Amino acid sequence: MVMACRVVNKRRHMGLQQLSSFAETGRTFLGPLKSSKFIIDEECHESVLISSTVRLLESLDLTSAVGQLLNEAVQAQNNTYRTGISTLLFLVGAWSSAVEECLHLGVPISIIVSVMSEGLNFCSEEVVSLHVPVHNIFDCMDSTKTFSQLETFSVSLCPFLQVPSDTDLIEELHGLKDVASQTLTISNLSGRPLKSYELFKPQTKVEADNNTSRTLKNSLLADTCCRQSILIHSRHFNRTDNTEGVSKPDGFQEHVTATHKTYRCNDLVELAVGLSHGDHSSMKLVEEAVQLQYQNACVQQGNCTKPFMFDISRIFTCCLPGLPETSSCVCPGYITVVSVSNNPVIKELQNQPVRIVLIEGDLTENYRHLGFNKSANIKTVLDSMRLQEDSSEELWANHVLQVLIQFKVNLVLVQGNVSERLIEKCINSKRLVIGSVNGSVMQAFAEAAGAVQVAYITQVNEDCVGDGVCVTFWRSSPLDVVDRNNRIAILLKTEGINLVTAVLTNPVTAQMQIKEDRFWTCAYRLYYALKEEKVFLGGGAVEFLCLSCLHILAEQSLKKENHACSGWLHNTSSWLASSLAIYRPTVLKFLANGWQKYLSTLLYNTANYSSEFEASTYIQHHLQNATDSGSPSSYILNEYSKLNSRIFNSDISNKLEQIPRVYDVVTPKIEAWRRALDLVLLVLQTDSEIITGHGHTQINSQELTGFLFL
């Protein structure tokens, strides 16, 4: 499919130009307010609606070497983390342009690779100061209560980015005690604790709301003043005196204040809202799925003696296009769709526990397990004329049915494909066969129902059959949930099964894939936050810290002696050391420009700024303040603590108290940075081998430009 084309200068690094072109197509997917795209096939003129970077790349022509490398990097990030893909693609483009600028200024390739790699490593170390511990999330959770409060939250999209002023923020109906217990506090330089959500109020609206919210503020401050201020998750805040210098490469000093209050998150709803990035409906389903898993773990373990771990491998989705979005929900058990021809079978089985058989491979006549060697020179002789008239598949299907009847099996789950002929016979005998079942579902039913998975139906015996499975319609009126493919949704469950299914519905079929992608993105964000027990202060704070630190390093490098600059890289040649002193500030500034473009685009995509230039000017103002402070991390944390700060709020609704903090996952974000830079540097070094070769000198003038089709 073709989206656009771009002029490519063949005398420049073509691979870097191609990376920039590919990345340009995904700019609108950066940030919480994404703009969808219609991709039109140039051959059949069919269109596809997409709203994510992964789906975008699936629709582009990536047959070139650079396109394949980009696709591999994106797929690796998506298959592992399911988040951070838009960040990866954008930084690939931004840093490709940065490298091109470095080459244009004559910076040696080895210097570019060394300084950019070290610069990113330095940023990865610095952002540790913005970690927020996630502990004891489930300690105070009621195992008998199902949360549905997430839908009432409206999240602040970003410290730099905020909800437009006309956004309707719905009040969270918690008592003062609940609000106080869930509100996180920090202290400013004077030591006065402040509510975390005060950070988002504009100065013009502080005075107007001062009287109406004074009672709530006093109650919260009284509760939080008693909390001890200790930050143990950052090397910047473990000093006993007020300010202390922390050693950095090239003499970079981090002056911080020891009076900062520790940011913590110990509430599941708050964490889920912070990680939703504006997609409240999807995160609400994820949060309910976690709650159901927690309830099941409490029942199985008895008072939850073991720490609860969110198992994302036991979460599944069932997409039902054509139904209203209000039908989306989360249910314990396994929900799937079957043909409406199974309707009489479901009605027959729904009022009784059924016995189950689990088949690992295909349930077809010709299926053989992996590694099977067919015996040679063997012929089958049939001595019955009646059997000869029947097909071999008919004989096989009859045999399978006899096995099911013998062991009184009414439900068969198959991991692979199922013979259509067998399905027909089973329907006639009131037996349900379901194919293409996920392996984790098979394992869950094996554990809960006591069944044993087998490769062939001939291996079934009494010990392999499970029991106690309930089969029913997902809704009491099955005809109300028939999708456009003439299928109905059914629910399979048994006592103690560790399975949760999110039913995703949408009246627009074209948006069904988008809804499922967003659900899994939210699920993996919450999964990694709980797994790592830490998150970032999100919404641009981390990238702003990287931008600020790199600018400070670049400015300090200009003032350093050559030997001091070369001390950052050890065991290098004298040529590299001397070149490093000359070019290092330039490379660091271009690397930082990638973060500047990232934040500017993020701001522009929220529609709070009329142009990226205006957004960039806004960021530049705070960048100067952070640089002048000498401690970017302290500047960011101090701005969080200020009641009237504008670095983390633009024009925002006056309903302040409903706006919680925004978070980012740690490892997926950093890995997206690393993959982006690794890809750019790989293409850079590959291009250098090709362009500096003999063939480059023979390029004709009329071949200097060309078109890159995307």
Swiss-Prot record:
GO terms for cellular component: cilium. The keyword Acetylation does not apply. Changing residue 501 to M: In BBS12; significantly reduces the interaction with MKKS; shows significantly decreased interaction with BBS7; the interaction with BBS10 is not affected by this mutation. This is Chaperonin-containing T-complex member BBS12. It is linked to Bardet-Biedl syndrome 12: A syndrome characterized by usually severe pigmentary retinopathy, early-onset obesity, polydactyly, hypogenitalism, renal malformation and intellectual disability. Secondary features include diabetes mellitus, hypertension and congenital heart disease. Bardet-Biedl syndrome inheritance is autosomal recessive, but three mutated alleles (two at one locus, and a third at a second locus) may be required for clinical manifestation of some forms of the disease. GO terms for molecular function: ATP binding. Keywords: Bardet-Biedl syndrome, Cell projection, Ciliopathy, Cilium, Disease variant, Intellectual disability, Obesity. Belongs to the TCP-1 chaperonin family. BBS12 subfamily. GO terms for biological process: chaperone-mediated protein complex assembly; eating behavior; fat cell differentiation; intraciliary transport; negative regulation of fat cell differentiation; negative regulation of stem cell differentiation; photoreceptor cell maintenance; stem cell differentiation. Changing residue 408 to R: In a patient with Bardet-Biedl syndrome compound heterozygote for BBS2 mutations; uncertain significance. Adipocytes derived from BBS-patients' dermal fibroblasts in culture exhibit higher propensity for fat accumulation when compared to controls. This strongly suggests that a peripheral primary dysfunction of adipogenesis participates in the pathogenesis of obesity in BBS.
